[in-house]
Amino acid sequence: MSEQPANQPDIPIAGQEFLQVFLPYELRLAQRRAMVTSSRSPDRSPGTCLGLYCVRLEPIKGDWFPAPLGGVSQISDHVQALLRDVIRDSDIPIRLSDQEHLAILRDLDPEHTYVVSQRFLAMAADSDILLAANLRTRVGYVVYPLSSQPNFPTENWRVLVDLARKMSDRAQPTGRACGHGLLRGPAMIESGIPESDLIPLALRDPDALAKVGLLQIQRIHLMPNV
């Protein structure tokens, strides 16, 4: 179990208890599906995946959550509403704290992972509520499984949440919304590195793994009318 990163709000007890049951189950299911579908695919890529999307709010400048909007809860509820607009009914949005949210996208088409983040960030960038509160939106996501050998211990689900956080914290944004995602790279088939080795390395230095093609890092570019 990984330690909580510095300056990150801990997961409330109710959310923690839910994730301790739900997320390991979904990870195991994603592992089994990947092993079955990749065995039928010429490039051993999974037909579906699990998307872990971490949404974080931060002040562009000044104080956290300035006064005019009547408190934190309205902004937090607004972010949850934005998430529900871009995910399906079968997906799960979770409020980790007022500043941080998690969305678990089940049985996701790997080609659709980028679109989900792009749509959400476009809506966040256009939000009058977030604009009035002077807040920036960051999204980091992990497309699971990351390896053709998906053997990551599912009880260590917090590590994957931490990895999504790490992706949300990449680079210094210039606008009101930014996002980065992590997914398996083209060299993964040849390497066959198991997730039990890959994911701890990714948490320390995803860029090094991306340079050798074991992983890919996607940067979300906002487009008009997305």
Describe the function of each predicted region.
Residues 1-38, 43, 75, 199-223:
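PAS-family sensory modules
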Residues 9-31, 35, 44-54, 58-84, ...:
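Conserved long alpha-helical elements within nucleotide-processing catalytic cores of c-di-GMP signaling
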Residues 29, 45-52, 62, 158, ...:
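C-terminal output/effector regions of signal-responsive regulators
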Residues 33, 85-90, 122-132, 170-171:
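Short catalytic/binding micro-motifs of nucleotide second-messenger systems
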Residues 51, 95-106, 131-167, 178-189:
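A short glycine-enriched loop-to-beta-strand structural element that forms part of the catalytic core
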Residues 73-74, 78, 88-89, 104, ...:
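Flexible loop/N-cap segments at domain edges
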Residues 117-122, 138-141:
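Active-site/pore-lining binding-face segments in mid-to-C-terminal subdomains
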Residues 128, 159-191, 197-217:
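Catalytic/regulatory signature loops of cyclic-dinucleotide turnover enzymes
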